[in-house]
Regions:
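An acidic/histidine-cluster motif and surrounding catalytic segment
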Residues: 1-41, 46-180
Length: 180
């Protein structure tokens, strides 16, 4: 943190004990969202394209009040799909957590235990967002594993569920802006 090459305000939040990865990420993002309306989230092993910062800054501002949009991907695993697009992004239901941005309004609805999962038409939700049967089966297993589990081993399936349950779209760049 001391070697940052740009001027910025730095907040350091230290924990007195190891709470585990899932709870640490949630607590850390709760803290960040208590101070900021929109956040770019990246992990320590990710490299972002220099243009990703402008991409996120522009879109986090442009769509901050648009509740149809819940997530900004920085990954595009199929850039050939968007070959010839004139825009720098498109809307998708695919939520990628390898570098992303979102808003406080979305993070406040995130719940590690996913209590809504047991109360909805699960097959209907999965059919809406997953076209392949194998994908639906795999994601259902992961959602079942994390639903009402106060000791989950990951945080990201709950985030995907949060976005899908709220029927939000993700902004996806036409070219990949993040390497994991």
């Amino acid at each position: 943190v001391k070697s940052l090459s740009w001027e910025c305000e730095v907040h350091i939040k230290k924990e007195s004990s190891n709470k585990g990865m899932v709870h640490q990420i949630k607590n850390g993002l709760d803290y960040v969202f208590s101070k900021h309306e929109g956040v770019l989230f990246m992990q320590d092993d990710q490299l972002l394209s220099p243009s990703s910062y402008n991409f996120v800054t522009e879109l986090i501002t442009k769509y901050k009040d648009d509740e149809r949009i819940g997530h900004i991907n920085l990954s595009n695993f199929n850039p050939s799909f968007t070959k010839g697009y004139s825009s720098s992004y498109f809307f998708s239901s695919h939520i990628k957590v390898w570098g992303f941005a979102t808003w406080r309004r979305m993070w406040h609805s995130y719940n590690i235990e996913m209590p809504e999962w047991s109360q909805i038409d699960q097959n209907g939700l999965l059919r809406k967002f997953c076209s392949r049967r194998n994908e639906r089966i795999g994601i259902k297993k992961m959602f079942d594993l994390h639903c009402n589990n106060n000791d989950p081993w990951t945080w990201d399936y709950q985030w995907v569920f949060n976005c899908w349950y709220r029927n939000t779209l993700a902004i996806t760049p036409t070219r990949n802006l993040c390497i994991d």
